[in-house]
Amino acid sequence: MFWIALGVMIVTLISMACCGSVRRKAPMNFIFLALFTLAQSFLLGITSAKFRSNEVMLAVGITAAVCLGLTLFAFQSKWDFTVMGGVLFVAMIVLLLFGIIAIFFPGKTITIVYASGGALLFSIYLIYDTQMMMGGQHKYSISPEEYIFAALNLYLDIINIFMYILTIIGASRD
């Protein structure tokens, strides 16, 4: 069941990212979002089950506070984060490569460094995606008919922040 959920999540994510007709036209966009959400929630449940309940609740609280603070910052900030798409993409590739290297050097320290970098990167992505969704005076924005895709971006940012914070908390207890 895990592999089916992972496959559904990857296929729906790639379909929505690459196919404009899938992410712009109802009801297709709602169907893909629902499929993605179901698959992601199953995977998130499996992953969260590997941690203690108090650790998961602490991660939920920290994630909620971080996301609220970053969203308020994105609304109030004079800085335009929408021009940082290329830099964030390169940072994502660096994080991916660091994660692959970290597999061969397991340990508490490298796990915490990796998870901290991921939490920081997706925190910046949350600001970036929030400003992209807002449009207005920012240089770049997401068009209004792509509201499902914008919601998916925010959802992914928040889930990734949660997972990295949970990893930090889990690695800290060991």
Question: Which positions does each model-derived feature cover?
Answer:
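A hydrophobic alpha-helical transmembrane-helix feature that marks the membrane cores
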Residues: M1-D174
